[in-house]
């Protein structure tokens, strides 16, 4: 058993607590709620505040693998205080990757000023840029993807005049315009094959529309979409037979861990109009991949006539995906939730321990498959923030906790959404000068 340690955190403005203290058997009403969560060893402290704004102090005691936090709270200037029942946080033996990469973007509909790809060290509150849109005259920067979660080999899109896909491989940085090689199609939603040579992309013609007086005021949808492959050895691209068919919309490719199967989402239809969007339901499908060739047999993994799947992510026999009422852009769907499939049995369930009344969308597994990071709008319904949960390997997730911040109010002060979180195994080096040289 680890030695017992006591940490006293004075989070109140007053130097001392009131003299009259009563006790409560309830946990303290705090935000974010971190009572009973499971955390990785060495993560930055999970700071919180009282929901009602009262001053407080917190005493944290670690016994073995459990951190107990006792909170005493009082109104400013009052002689009376309440000490709440200590609440636990379980420290897991399963390690977590040291960094998370994501995009930060203002949640506007049409325009943005600043956006960029950033990385957060989980052992601290330190956030550093990977690439911002200052490199390409404030164009769009998005669609980052890492080979095997490596900070030394990855790609991202930098759009606008002279734009393309930026490929990083150690000290080498290059720009490839996918529309000028092979198929002539642009690529989004990249997924790097575990072997390192191939990358699957979706190639989509995307629109957004607004509705007045509708429960869904904005809708983003693909009019057309296919899946294409890139060979990084030759910088060539080609359409995948059976995954770029007329009469179908294919998107969101994702490789299995062994690289022997490609999962993707597919809906029926040549082209889709805004008026038809509510009738479009994407199924989960997969196709075998061996020795650089795809099988002609496409399997249906999951399908529902009244729901749509997106973002399939495989972890051994488990597949985590986002389910929404329809369409292919769940971030604007309040009903969007995370679902888990057992690929061996075919059983599917709503991950109620992670879901909320608001949007849950993009998600990513850690490299050891024991943690998941996902995006949620549960705090205010507008800004997307990141939550982390432990996975026991048997189909169960722990209560999620909000990405720790030095002060909880930072979550309200940051007027940007976290987008496409991905675990990475180390810190990405600063290559800003090399990126800027690509766009001169």
Label each region the model flagged.
Residues 16-440:
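Sequence signature of WD/YWTD-type beta-propeller architectures
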Residues 1-22:
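Bacterial Sec-dependent N-terminal signal peptides
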